[in-house]
Amino acid sequence: MTTAPATTEAPQQEQAPSARPGRDRYFDLLRALALFRVVLYHLTGWAWLPLVFPSMGVMFALAGNLMARSLRRPAVRVIRGRLRRLLPPLWLLGVVGVTGMVLQGWGPDADGHPGWWWLHLTFWIVPFSDPPYAEGLPGVPGIIGENWAADLAGPLWYIRAYLWYVLLSPLLLKALRALPVVTLSAPIVLAVAFEQGWLTLPGERIPSALTDFSTFGACWILGMAHQEGILRRLPRYIVPSVAPVIALVGLWYALRHDFGTGNDLDSMPLAQALWSFGTVLLLLHVSPSWSEWPDRLRRWAGPIALLNSRAVTIYLWHNTCILVAATLWDHLWGFPVLEQNVPGLLESPWPVLVLVWVLIGGCVLAFGWMEDLAAKQKPRLWPRGEPRVRKRR
């Protein structure tokens, strides 16, 4: 009987000093590293990169952590706020991308029936399922390669998955508080069921969504568990003992199924789920919760702040930037002096990576302001720090 008042008063006590807790610089660092690794991986395709740093699991865990913190407020208000921040950058991408597809011949006959095309087009507005795109487009010679729409649409599965995690978060949080072990385990159990063929579903859209949920759902819930203090209540030796075992089981499974270039963790949902869960669990366990940057990282505060302020823009546009950069770089093969004397430079991914980030910077300037508008902040072309937050009435 003595615990009831404590549980009802705790949120009020936590919110009393400040309606908006300060930023955790450790989480900012993880998010920036995750974005950089995503760009590098999509450029190079190096299979070992997701093992070094499981970016998608980290990004979902950080988002789940923020969602759990926000759910101290009414759920409907929180969900509306999250969608308001998420969707406008997607709409801007859609305006540019869908317009380009239509200009190159994409239209209502693409799905076999005009009704399906128009229906699926609404997923560019609210991505309950993957937004459609045109296949086999010719591109723009010398600027952007063929089938560019597939590259532009490649990152959109993350937006769709994020949307569903946000919508399900109030239920997931209630389940986590009531049955933490069962709730954390459920996505991985679902991944096992899919992998072993115990659960099969017709079509492509629903199985795709459930596969993504089973792959990264445990990471989202881990972030919520961290915010709720569930992980901190465990004996200190539990996580360092259990997390590496879970991750190594995922690695073992990947190696047993011909892990390598072209067949990495992205092609193995169960291995991805286990490796990401174990690694993210360790990263959250060692979380130092920096309110200020350590001296050795202070010089990187500006770039990290930029990456965090424009995370959605960078993620949405990076694939297209990679395709444009690769197309432009290929022009250098037309210079015999370069081909004969520095073929290693032309084959190296590092100059292309620099060009990719220059193009990403251009996208930040051209499209990043939409993230500020979506957050009801004053638009900024090039964020150098944290924006001013409007006081809630």
What residue spans do the PLM features occupy?
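Alpha-helical transmembrane segments and their immediate juxtamembrane cytosolic regions
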Residues: 2-393
